[in-house]
Amino acid sequence: MLYSTCNFLQKVTLNCFSNYEVSGRENVPPVGPLIVVSNHLSNIDPSIVAVSVSRRLKFLAKSSLFAGPFISGLLRWYGAYPLHRDRIDVASFKWALNQLREDGVILIFPEGTRSRGSMIRAKSGVARLVQMSDATILPVGITGTEHIGNVLRVVNPTGDIKVNIGSPFSLPKMDGPIDSPILKSMTDLIMERVSVLLPETYRGVYSLKKDHNK
């Protein structure tokens, strides 16, 4: 109930205060475990992706946002789970894996933090999660939210906000232990699929990549 209500209100504010556009909604798989992977520009990106994708999303959020029982309860009710970025967070990884094993949808921002407009090098946890879950990957590119810094701007999003949803894809299943170079290569492949959904100026370290969505 809270998730649907929040998303409805977010759509209202987007339509009232911004030039909001979504392309590629038809690419969202209707069923099955799904990892939605996006670039990250603003604290309001999770809600922007949530209203743009037709399935119920759950996501990891930095643990510092879970301040106090009220905010913590609200975030969890909306679908968030705390991620401790200062260490290897086994609990959050297991939580995400359990959601996928129940055919759920997890939203991940592999860069690990907001970029300053162009993509930065992603962390390899997303590739490990894909390997352990066999989930389909859905790349998403967001532009226009980088000027919205404060999370309270969720009620007043302005500017040209574009969400581009790419074609879903899968990675080959690897048998046995996977070393760091292979995980990095898989992560780069995933992020390249995100980067081609963005204008060149947003692609950062993943610029000049082939457009897999054409």
Kindly give the residue locations of the regions a language model identified.
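A short, acidic/glycine-rich surface segment
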Residues: I44-D45, A67-G68, A91-S92, E146-L152, ...
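Alpha-helix C-terminal capping segments
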Residues: V51-S54, E102, Q131-T136
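Catalytic-site beta-strand/loop segments enriched in glycine and acidic/polar residues
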Residues: Q99-V126
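Membrane-interfacial terminal anchoring regions of lipid-handling membrane enzymes
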Residues: M1-F8, V12-N15, E21-P30, N98-R101, ...
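Short gly/ser/thr-rich secondary-structure transition/capping motifs
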Residues: N15-S23, R87, T145-H147
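A cross-family acyltransferase "interaction/gating" segment
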Residues: M119-P181, D211-N213
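Catalytic core of membrane glycerolipid acyltransferases/transacylases, capturing the structured
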Residues: L2, C6-F8, N15-C16, V28-R87, ...
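Residue-level preference for the first positions of well-ordered beta-strands
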Residues: P33-I35, D103-F109, L138
